[in-house]
Amino acid sequence: GFKSNSIGLHGISLGAVPVIFAANKEQNVNAIWVDSSLAEFSMVLQDEIARYGLSIEFGPAVSFFGKLLSGVDPIDLNPAERLTNDQNYFFTHGDKDQRMLVRHFHYFEKYNEENNIKSEFWLAENSYHVDGMFKYPDLYAAKMKKFFEDNLK
């Protein structure tokens, strides 16, 4: 087994969403690294609809059929609302991300400040989706190492 204070998670892009949800259910996870995640489903729905040049009026229909097909209401899939005050988070994002727009990163910043969520943030300059780890591998690794060492004692 593992000591309860030695468990950390790392989630990238859409993979960060189940990491956040899992950490919410497992309070022994002390440190969560989130790279290029969506913050709220309604935001990503708007982003994707706009990406294809469709009107936002399609949003409710997309949500309805998503729920009908999966049995899960996509509106309930809001990672920001699953963050806890008992865990530590590190958020990173590319400032030029066109896949998961940087407004998700800023949403996390604002939400975490308003809700006293223990978190650190790094916006990787001149970086697109999940680019930070590739454009700045040494800095990315150093930040990750420090974050996990500081929070998994």
Q: Which stretches of residues belong to each language-model region?
A:
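Core-facing hydrophobic residues within beta-strands of well-ordered domains
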Residues: S4, V29-N30, S119
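Hydrolase active-site cap/lid region
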Residues: F21-V72
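Short beta-strand/loop motif that positions the catalytic acidic residue
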Residues: L83-N85, F90-H93, D97
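Alpha/beta-hydrolase fold nucleophile elbow
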Residues: F2-I12
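C-terminal catalytic histidine-bearing segment of alpha/beta-hydrolase fold enzymes
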Residues: H106-K153
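Short beta-strand immediately N-terminal to the catalytic nucleophile in serine-hydrolase-like folds
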Residues: L9-G11, D35, T92
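Gly/Ala-rich beta-loop-alpha elbow adjacent to hydrolase catalytic centers
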Residues: G11-G15, V19
